[in-house]
């Protein structure tokens, strides 16, 4: 119980620090998507995305919710009987990056670097046995915490040992990725590998 209370105190501090961060001038008016809505601190599986979407998590404050990427993500989780209640979800950049016209954009390397200490602290607090990166930005973000030489195109849908954990790099569930880089059938197969990693880590049975 004392350990759990310590984790909660550390997480509460992390949330407060992320909320008050002003390192990225282009995102100072955005809210960091990091709270109890990201998942349970007891999670042994952590999913890391790119950044909150304008119509999704930036609006709902729940990672991968409120937009088509979130719907796709929920469908893929359900395919291996994995519930949000069992996992923790965060992202390489905690705030929503936008273009001058207001559209979503990828976070810059500087923005990801600015957020890297939040990601590192989240990993330390939750201490997951399995880390699943969703897309190349998330995979590259891990390099700032513990070096790896993986790239998504060559390393997707394989299980690696990274930083004393199992790492599964897979593609992002966005409609654009599904239409151009990784079709639904392939992504569903990728999630079967996530289930395999979960079983390999001795956590719980995924269907």
What would you call each of these model-derived segments?
Residues 2-154, 160-205:
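A polyanion-binding, active-site-adjacent surface
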């Amino acid at each position: 119980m004392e350990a759990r209370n310590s984790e909660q105190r550390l997480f509460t501090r992390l949330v407060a620090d992320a909320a008050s961060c002003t390192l990225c001038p282009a995102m100072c008016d955005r809210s960091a998507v990091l709270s109890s809505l990201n998942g349970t601190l007891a999670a042994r599986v952590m999913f890391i995305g790119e950044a909150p979407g304008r119509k999704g998590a930036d609006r709902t404050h729940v990672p991968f919710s409120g937009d088509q990427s979130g719907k796709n993500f929920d469908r893929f989780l359900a395919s291996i009987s994995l519930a949000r209640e069992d996992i923790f979800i965060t992202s390489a950049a905690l705030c929503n990056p936008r273009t001058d016209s207001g559209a979503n954009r990828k976070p810059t390397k500087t923005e990801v670097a600015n957020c890297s200490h939040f990601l590192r602290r989240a990993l330390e607090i939750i201490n997951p046995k399995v880390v699943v990166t969703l897309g190349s930005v998330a995979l590259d973000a891990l390099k700032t915490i513990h070096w790896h030489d993986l790239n998504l195109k060559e390393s997707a849908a394989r299980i690696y040992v990274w930083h004393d954990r199992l790492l599964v790099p897979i593609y992002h569930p966005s409609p654009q990725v599904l239409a151009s880089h990784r079709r639904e059938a392939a992504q569903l197969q990728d999630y079967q590998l996530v289930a395999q990693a979960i079983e390999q880590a001795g956590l719980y049975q995924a269907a």
